[in-house]
Amino acid sequence: GEKSLFFYGIVERLFSQVNIRSDFLTSEAFRNDPLFLRNQFEGEGTFQIPIVKKQHISLEQLKFIGYDHIKSDERENKDSVVHFFLDDYKFEVLWNHPEPRLEKLKQYKAVLTPQYSLYTEMPITLQIYNTFRNRWVGAYLQSNGIAVIPTMCWGEPQSFWFCFDGVEVGSFV
């Protein structure tokens, strides 16, 4: 009715301000979008945590650069490994909109998986979700030709049973 048209108009204006198509909200395309489903990678464990495949990456003379310091046209740090040991908000965009960041990340020797927080004060559900995000981004980057080194973390012993999921045995971590 009239109220739903009003609401739809507000939503359409909001999304036009952030460059999201409002027709995407009601379309079948959104429901089937891989960035919505996040199901394109093989999963492991009870929660189907995406698998970051083992890769051989030379660990000699590693240099690191924070994700917040990478450049579009890197010249001096191409042999560096990108890390995410930063506040989560500085790399949240990689989860929400990963594709536009690919070319920037491809310039570097390798990329660590993003270390989304697993604070002990967080509900276990959020810790599992952040572990899923860590591995999904790693699998996504690998599927786009980027060398990835998985990172792992845990809060308390209750997180041990899922924090290793999605990392192939024998991987450098």
Residue spans of the language-model regions?
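Polybasic, lysine-rich low-complexity intrinsically disordered segments
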Residues: K3-S4
